[in-house]
């Protein structure tokens, strides 16, 4: 098991995770969206009728798989720890911010890497903002930022989320009429449920054992000069790059499928996501994994992300995808990007993150 704590071991786990993502892409998940925590939570909230955007409504088994995979492996390896009490209200609203800003970019950090592997230039632009956000968060960590200590709680607290998502998914299979499903758009594109669930389970196991975190990998490089976590991300990128080249999906373009090329908003939205992820202690994927391994604080964050996903579409905060005119298919050119509501939300979010960061540093110094 020590092997998987080395750079080579983590790279191997990343390659396995990348193969899972490639399989989902091959089996029908949307282009450049084989795996996206933000998009899949958004789709799931839509399927449960929390928003009415008809093209993004599907109960994604991958989300269930990640939570259950992390939960089961943590029990098996005795790494399960039920904790809570670290600024839950602040974490909830940070979860909302992280989700809405990800949907302004049209993807979480995981999807950003998948888009980069397909040659989507707008994702590289987003990466610049994400890295800057992580650097800003790391600066405040150096200054002593903390949301407060988490305390041990009854272990049954950590069982609630895995049980709830398992029951909700069982109802999808047994009584699908309880949910709504997209008939067109990204929500209508998906791998068969048992493959999606299986890959999600494996992904959850790998993410828990490797501590996979897109913000954490950059944070460790900045603060510790430690590149080990980045090896996992590199493995995913390499596999998806090979897959995209092999399937002729790799193209250097201003924006790929379900993306936009509004540079300033790609940068600012991912800046907020990176900053927020460091303050929370993990990116959207990491929050799912921690929620599955007993962290009530991460459960609160995930609930915030779920609410944020519905909020983004109900209040027109999410960005629209850009489109190139195609008269033969009846497609009109569209610039895409966020409307004024989304733009205002991103700016307010960045201001709020600085307030939280300054407060977290000040509180620790006054102890």
Spans of model-derived segments:
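Membrane-interfacial helix-loop segments of redox and metal-homeostasis proteins
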Residues: 1-367
